[in-house]
Amino acid sequence: MTIQIYNTLTRQKEIFKPLEEGKVKMYVCGPTVYNYIHIGNARPAIVFDTVRRYLEYRGFDVDYVLNFTDVDDKIIKTAKDVGEEVPVLADRFVNAYLEDVGALGVKKATKNPRVMDTMDDIIAFISALIEKGYAYEADGDVYFKPRSFDTYGKLSHQSIDELRSGARIQVGEKKEDPLDFALWKQAKDDEIAWKSPWGEGRPGWHIECSAMVKKHLGDTIDIHAGGQDLTFPHHENEIAQSEAMNGETFANYWMHNGYINIDNEKMSKSLGNFVLARDLIQAHDPRVLRFFMLSVHYRNPINFTEALLESAKTSLERIQTAYHNLSHRRDSSLNLTNDDAKWLQLVSAAMSKFEQDMDDDFNTANAISVLFDLSKEANVYLQENQTSTEVIDAFQDAISQILTVLGINILEDEETLLDETIEALIKERNEARKNRNFARADEIRDMLKEKGIVLEDTPQGVRWKRGK
């Protein structure tokens, strides 16, 4: 099988061919750290972490770089408003980001470069662009000339003339052409600044990523990823800067995730429907939030509602319950029989389907459907009088492998079941008793007892508590 990636640059799926066999250079645009991240920021963190996980599952060594923009107009303003130094504020929100995405199951990046630590590289990059004729200095500012780069607009599929018609020079700007964008900004009074050949100042946003990519991954990388909103101008400008500088293709594959809507409206501060990731993490199991994010293909918009999140919770519980049921039956299972061959074949086919779905532009929505099918078939298998450890292990290994790629860990619940899972098992036990399937009802009671959960049947229904 071969992996296909939808490339924003060509607007089609392409077979993934890394620059170096067995290795992947991947760069993801991280946050500007002036506040806690909202769920729109959390989506690319989850999506591209999952892409990384699948590439690693397929045997690739992934050099995964995610940057932090730690100096910016918004950061400077926020620092002034709260009376903090810019580096102190940036550190605080870098740590908050890592805490939030860590709770969402995001693996640590290979590197997390920051702008303040890359200043010498940024200045050297800008100097080279000036020497090559792609940029110019204007009274302490430095601007890049998109018209000097022949293929400008190729990522966003816009012509230079179309872009020119909507561009304006703002009051106070020193650029020669409305399309020109800042590589270096002259320092303002009382703002953090760095020394440069053009006087004290700080870099523009776009040049920061180009310099960090070059420093940590080289002139050409395999995958560059980020939110759909970054396609233009940020990623377009990155391409122009980097390819003008290096004379090489900047990135072979460009990946962009879709927007998040809140109750069918685009999330924005002006609408007041701005949802912080950490608020959801505190209110819900973060694994449910991740599961919800992956239930829709990454390129599609996703609509967030509490009802849909609750539905994701129920769906994940179904998978957890199937896994725990398998665990309970394993110890009482026997050796493999001839009748079990069909079940092993079913599990093998499911894993092939999972890989087929993920090979097709990382289709996590379809991969989750495979999980549901496996869970359903596992429950059917457990209804048989005799089960084998080999089949149970096959089911559990398959479910575990898929969940690991999706970044969802349910194994931590093996010793202490989540309350939601306990309730789901009690509900299943009630249904079994109602259908006079007393063997299954007793089996569930015994399983919960082994996990330290004591059931008490009362006239008002079943109550449960954790045993000492």
Curated annotation (Swiss-Prot):
Pfam families: CysS_C, DALR_2, tRNA-synt_1e. Its main location: cytoplasm. GO terms for biological process: cysteinyl-tRNA aminoacylation. It is found in: Cytoplasm. A motif ('HIGH' region) lies at residues 31-41. Zn(2+) binds at C29, C209, H234, E238. ATP binds at K269. Its EC number is 6.1.1.16. A motif ('KMSKS' region) lies at residues 266-270. One of its GO terms (cellular component) is cytosol. The keyword Thylakoid does not apply. Binds 1 zinc ion per subunit. GO terms for molecular function: ATP binding; cysteine-tRNA ligase activity; zinc ion binding. Its cofactor is Zn(2+). The modification Phosphoserine is found at S270. InterPro entries: Cys-tRNA-ligase, Cys-tRNA-synt_Ia_DALR, Cys-tRNA/MSH_ligase, CysS_C, Rossmann-like_a/b/a_fold, tRNA-synt_1_cat_dom, tRNAsynth_Ia_anticodon-bd. It catalyses: tRNA(Cys) + L-cysteine + ATP = L-cysteinyl-tRNA(Cys) + AMP + diphosphate. It comes from the Bacteria. Signal peptide: none annotated. Keywords: Aminoacyl-tRNA synthetase, ATP-binding, Cytoplasm, Ligase, Metal-binding, Nucleotide-binding, Phosphoprotein, Protein biosynthesis, Zinc. Monomer. Belongs to the class-I aminoacyl-tRNA synthetase family. This is Cysteine--tRNA ligase. The gene is cysS.
